[in-house]
From Swiss-Prot:
PANTHER family reported for this sequence: UNCHARACTERIZED PROTEIN YQGE, UPF0301 PROTEIN YQGE
Source organism per UniProt: Rhodococcus jostii (strain RHA1)
Family per record: Belongs to the UPF0301 (AlgH) family.
HAMAP family assigned to the protein according to its UniProt record, in alphabetical order: UPF0301
GO CC term, one of those recorded: cytosol
Disulfide bonds: none
SUPFAM superfamilies membership: VC0467-like (SSF143456)
Signal sequence segment: none
Alphabetized InterPro entries for the sequence: AlgH-like (IPR003774)
Superkingdom of this protein's organism: Bacteria
Protein name: UPF0301 protein RHA1_ro03630
Length: 201
């Protein structure tokens, strides 16, 4: 039986607890180039630590150049995204399921949250294709040991927000950082107007 649309497929809000499917949105105080206006999608969060990928850092490398068999399924832009500083030589793939599609029992798919799934890049793209709207492939990931992310949250380095499935495959032309904040209630939504270059003001 097809699952109903999860609430996070229609709306997203701030939440105090990190879980798979959360977004970590960098605060305006994080002005270092590596972290400024970063949005991380959390894939795992447990007693062993946390793992996620940066969803708004496209690289100049085309998916076709590294994993040509997955290029037809890659969401635009069909570029490899920089998921984080850990294991940059390894690839990780997320996808959004088509409405009504099920990942349970499908070899190569593992549900993360809602319509977002992890894809085993060794699986057959032709099997995956009918089930997904698009895939996003990341080089590397962002990781925290147990308690490390909690410390960063206590410093207000990150704002925790529920993700929409569409956030994972947002086009490069979309300012995901601003878009995610803009759909939050006031006063948080006002942060979306924060200038990209603070030196201009």
């Amino acid at each position: 039986m097809a699952h109903a649309e999860e609430p996070e497929d229609r709306t997203a809000s701030t939440e105090p607890v990190v879980r798979p499917g959360s977004l970590l949105v960098s605060s305006t105080d994080l002005v270092e180039p590596a972290f400024r206006r970063t949005v991380i999608y959390v894939i795992e969060h447990n007693d062993a630590g946390s793992l996620g990928v940066v969803i708004n850092r496209p690289s100049e490398t085309a998916v076709h150049d590294v994993l040509p068999q997955w290029a037809p399924l890659a969401a635009r832009p069909s570029a490899l995204y920089v998921g984080g500083p850990v294991k940059r030589d390894a690839a990780l793939c997320l996808a959004t399921l088509r409405t009504g599609a099920q990942a349970d029992g499908v070899a190569g798919l593992r549900r993360v949250h809602g319509r977002v799934v992890m894809v085993d890049l060794d699986s057959d793209p032709e099997v995956i294709a009918p089930l997904v709207e698009g895939v996003r492939i990341f080089a590397g990931y962002s990781g925290w040991t147990y308690g490390q992310l909690d410390s960063e949250l206590q410093r207000d380095d990150w704002i925790v927000i529920s993700a929409l499935a569409s956030d994972v495959v947002a086009p490069a032309r979309v300012d995901v950082w601003a878009q995610v904040l803009r759909r939050q209630p006031l006063p948080l939504a006002l942060l979306a107007t924060h200038p990209i270059d603070v030196e201009r003001n």
